[in-house]
Amino acid sequence: MKYLTKSRVIATIAMLGCLSVSAWAETPTNQPESLTDKALKHEKLGVVVESANHKFAEKYRLQYDSWKATAESTDRSSALEADPRLVVLWAGYAFAKEYNKPRGHYYAVTDVREILRTGAPKDENDGPQPMACWTCKGPDVPRLIEEKGERGYFDPKWAKYGAEIVNSIGCADCHDTTSKAFEEGKPALRVARPHVLRALESVGWRFEDLDKHGKRVAVCSNCHVEYYFKDKKDVTFPWAKGVDVDSIEKYYDESQFTDWTHALSKAPMLKTQHPDFEVWSQGVHGKNGVTCIDCHMPKVKDKDGKVYTEHKIGNPFDRFDATCKTCHEQSKQTLQDRVKEHKAQVKEAMIRLEDQIVKAHFEAKVAWDAGATAEEMQDILMAIRHAQWRWDYSAAGHGNHFHAPDVMLHTIATGLDRVADARAKLGVVLTKHGVETPIVMPDISTREKAQKAVGIDIAKDQAAKDEFLRTVVPQWERQARERGLLPEVTPKSVTTPKVDAK
């Protein structure tokens, strides 16, 4: 393997699982109050956010067209159909209704509108979800937070600003698009979500003190992180004790936070989001200063030889010469085979853990039905919580098997330990209450059968969602066009620029 092109190395504080900023920091100078300082005081940042993506199409044509090409990632296949165990793991939570495989940034707003999890609100005060569900979906979010303040943004229901959040993840999520530097063609990277600035500060990643490589990672942490809704409203990163699986679990346990109570086992559950920043930081690439941008947004050339940053975020192997080959001497096939092997190992272990947790949930329900007491079940439910947290920390990320396969295998192994403890104790409780073991497990071989087993009526939810998409969403888009947040005519096609690796 060649020497890495970057000399900077992230130092990991093992005790806390925190990241050290020292290797990524620039020497600060006397400057006016920073955005981080304002965020820490919960003040408005005083920024201008031009959130309409289409307004940058002409000046930054190469970047814009490559960003727009994320629309080619159209596969929205159901993860619940591929693995019906997920329905049981999330029983009682909206993810058990619909959970699809991720697709391109271009669809961020469309997908959150259409997913069953956001319900079918009839007006701005209706629906099951808070505004927080929009927070990662596009640059209209930091614009609204600046206009309304954090309370004005986070307090309402999800439907309140449906006509305002219409631009999918784009330019102003990462760039200060109104700055002189951006006008001159410089990156002008910026984080304009106050809660993200506070979270970065909590792990020593003060945004203003980061060098350009650190800032490239930090803008991705706007969204590619684990988070929860504090007080069921505010997007919060649970990093106060560190970013590894044990530190975040400890944070949640000590704050007595629960995403939901499981419909079968009654365990106080946690739902991991997508801890990509956290897992990357623990892996070989993160520890050696290789950033998200290096692998997913490399420098490429257009047909005339002009160099620009590829914004069609995707698999690094699709741009092998511009990504992997800048550090590795091995062939593309060799590296692909290695990644495939890691993925298979992690997936196999993950399925084993899923199987055990599913059984634990059903066994716990039988125990409750047989008359088990809260005292008898207390330790069992916490073991189930911890086992599933470890499974989800491994499963919810994008490419965890690549970013840190050793960390994932260790995390899953500790999850297997926790669920083994839960099931051993369940065996004792079941026997005590006269239940023969093993219990009879229901058929969960398909998504439909699994949803029936946990009592979900999808037909009713889908009918309501269809009506919402037919009546409410067109009104949102009409209002957005009137305000200039969307172009008057939606582009009919997507042009992918032809590029060669630099």
Curated annotation (Swiss-Prot):
Residues given in the record as heme binding sites: C133, C136, K137
Q: In which pathway does it act?
A: Nitrogen metabolism; nitrate reduction (assimilation)
Q: Would the keyword Transport turn up in this protein's UniProt record? A: yes
What residues bind heme c 2, as annotated?
C171, C174, H175, H311
What positions does the entry give for substrate binding? Y227, H274
Q: What is its EC number?
A: 1.7.2.2
* Sites where the protein binds Ca(2+): E226, Y227, K271, Q273
Q: Where is the protein situated, by its record's location annotation?
A: Periplasm
Annotated Pfam families: Cytochrom_C552 (PF02335)
| Secretion signal span | 1-25
Catalytic activity annotation: 6 Fe(III)-[cytochrome c] + NH4(+) + 2 H2O = 6 Fe(II)-[cytochrome c] + nitrite + 8 H(+)
GO term, biological process aspect, one: nitrate assimilation
Query: Segment Disordered: which positions?
Result: 481-502
Q: Which amino acids does the record list as binding heme c 3? A: H105, C220, C223, H224
Binding-site list for heme c 5:
H285, C324, C327, H328
Which cellular component, as a GO term, is one annotated location?
Answer: outer membrane-bounded periplasmic space
* Claim: Transport is one of the keywords in the record: yes
Positions contributing to heme c 4 binding: C292, C295, H296, H403
Cofactor(s) for this UniProt protein: Ca(2+); heme c
Transmembrane segments annotated in the record for this chain: none
Keywords of the record: Calcium, Electron transport, Heme, Iron, Metal-binding, Oxidoreductase, Periplasm, Signal, Transport
Q: Which family does it belong to?
A: Belongs to the cytochrome c-552 family.
What this chain does, per the entry, is described as: Catalyzes the reduction of nitrite to ammonia, consuming six electrons in the process.
What protein does this entry describe? Answer: Cytochrome c-552
By which gene is this protein encoded? Answer: nrfA
